[in-house]
Amino acid sequence: MTEEKASVRTYDPPEEFASRANVRDPGVYEEAARDYEGFWAERARKLHWFREWDEVLRWDPPEAQWFVGGKINASYNCLDYQVQQGRGDKRAIIWEGDEPGENRTLTYSELKAEVEKFANVLKGLGVRKGDAVSIYLPMIPELPIAMLACARIGAPHSVVFGAFSAQSLRDRINDCEAKVLVTADSGPRGGKRTPLKANADEALEDTPSIEKVVVVRRTGDEVNMVEGRDLWWHELMREAEPECPAEEMDSEDILYILYSSGSTGKPKGIVHTTGGYLTHVNTTTDWVFDLKEDDVYWCTADIGWVTGHSYIVYGPLSNGATALMFEGTPSYPANDRWWDIIERHGVTILYTAPTAIRAFMKQGPGPIEKHDLSSLRLLGSVGEPINPRAWEWYHEHVGGGRCPVVDTWWQTETGGIMISPLPGITRTKPGSATFPLPGIFAGIYDEEGNEIEGPGVGNLVIKRPWPGMLRTLYKDPERFRETYWQKYGDVYFSGDGARRDEDGYFWVTGRVDDVINVSGHRISTAEVESALVAHPAVAEAAVIGRYDEDTGQAIVAYVILEGGREGNDELAQELRQQVRKVIGAHARPQEIIFTPDLPKTRSGKIMRRILRSLSEGRDDLGDTTTLADPGVVESLKEQVAASR
């Protein structure tokens, strides 16, 4: 099916699905618009509060406080409250390891017991309310256990993605001044191992705030244990007291800090607080995924990213759902691993990224056809815009043509889903995230700050505060204002572009700033450039994202070498390794083009738009009148052609 045909076809919710859906009344949009504070207050009451709030929203742009005066605990809502409602013996987490046959299941009662013990471990290590804890773990149950233990005692957690380098870990620990680091000996993924403890040891050479390191024995690999600092998880848990009451947290107390790529290169510590965030992810998990008591829900993200925080841990568990966690990759040890997992565990809801879907398309439906996926009833997409052809393929081959597809738009900053179909109500168009959810007020603005009404293209904004919104950037309120609020005043600027069609559907077009989206991972161009320039052979580098049918975008680096040195394949490989070491494997450039010069304006600014056009093979380079040396473009065209 061509992109054009796919993008004009529409799909109504299947009748049987719609009749049982959690949200069946389209009037919910109007109800939320009429009294959106009342709407969110009603949703918040689905949670357990030790004390109800005095005020739903206090808004002093750009600072929002939700459920002011309310007392709540995220861990209590995800565990104790579920046990009280009779879910103690229900499976909370089904864990599937990297190697087939490695499985673990934790019921709500079992998860609660583990969390209470680890909360006491943290207290015993001197962690108090307000102290940050860094977590650098593979996708194992100890990761959500550590997060929920932090939430239980009021210690903000800062999870660092396991593929990040020692330097990235060090920078994040130092920024949040974590007191304790929780890591593992190593992390298996796709048959390979990441030396997490060795990376942590390197990072800890320069992290003055860290007092203790807790190490999970995941693989049994031999690791260096520093006496007096490093402690084994299993030994601490063996001695831990079994009961730890949940702290009564203010609604606006910090739940976690999660670092995201910024256009300046310095990672941004995005701060999410407790009451508003939990309300947002609890509601969106229930409504967007239409959760039922017997669902087995699988979000394939890593918990190191916000999708895992919101839609593996806090959203599903606060709804009493059964969530599946997978440590491995789609293709190890065979390319039908995911379909085998779905069949064996009876997965009913699958939430994954377009990158994975495009990889499966390349293999064809063969691996899927070996398995019975009839348990699936809903499919979701996250991380980047999904192209219509991938949407159609997902719907037809994975969902058997019967499962609604919810294409979701949101960000680390928004905390939870913002634009998405409601699967029992919304007529979907492949490639469109459809409409802002009830209680979310999205709009499209032009560069001058005028709102575009009706069909049009511009910058995607959110016009009113919402409960899951980031409250600030950790220790950097100025950057918070500058990044999200300076452009349009009281309106949140997302950094994404969008188009609205004649039916009011939103089509997200991707980043408009200097952040690249590779397989749903946001990577700062400035961060990659500074990693490249740190190599002694590199004089200057410019990094752009070009379209890639597998990963959405691919990283391309244009590199000027010192002293007229010639580039070669060996040096290109060395530079990729340099980026891997400084940032992580996910940020390695797919293509490195050596060039004697870069297209710059007379003021010295690199014109990345021209580099992007050249990389994508486009002849129309737009306005080039501001170039200091137009001849550079011709020479670059030759360099690009030679590199292909």
UniProtKB/Swiss-Prot annotation:
Keywords for this protein: Acetylation, ATP-binding, Ligase, Magnesium, Metal-binding, Nucleotide-binding
Maturation and modification: Acetylated. Deacetylation by the SIR2-homolog deacetylase activates the enzyme.
Binding site for Mg(2+): V533, H535, V538
Required cofactor(s): Mg(2+)
Gene Ontology CC terms: cytosol
Pfam families on file: ACAS_N (PF16177), AMP-binding (PF00501), AMP-binding_C (PF13193)
N6-acetyllysine modification, residue list: K605
Catalysed reactions, as listed in the record: acetate + ATP + CoA = acetyl-CoA + AMP + diphosphate
EC number per UniProt: 6.2.1.1
Biological process according to GO: acetyl-CoA biosynthetic process from acetate
Residues the entry annotates as binding CoA: R189, G190, G191, K192, T307, S519, R580
Taxonomic superkingdom: Bacteria
One Gene Ontology MF term: ATP binding
CDD domains: ACS
Entries under InterPro entries matching the protein: Ac_CoA_lig (IPR011904), ACAS_N (IPR032387), AMP-bd_C (IPR025110), AMP-bd_C_sf (IPR045851), AMP-binding_CS (IPR020845), AMP-dep_synth/lig_dom (IPR000873), ANL_N_sf (IPR042099)
Top enzyme category: ligase
Membrane-spanning intervals of the chain: none
General function of this protein: Catalyzes the conversion of acetate into acetyl-CoA (AcCoA), an essential intermediate at the junction of anabolic and catabolic pathways. AcsA undergoes a two-step reaction. In the first half reaction, AcsA combines acetate with ATP to form acetyl-adenylate (AcAMP) intermediate. In the second half reaction, it can then transfer the acetyl group from AcAMP to the sulfhydryl group of CoA, forming the product AcCoA.
Family: Belongs to the ATP-dependent AMP-binding enzyme family.
Name this polypeptide is given: Acetyl-coenzyme A synthetase
Lineage per the UniProt record: Bacteria, Bacillati, Actinomycetota, Rubrobacteria, Rubrobacterales
Gene: acsA
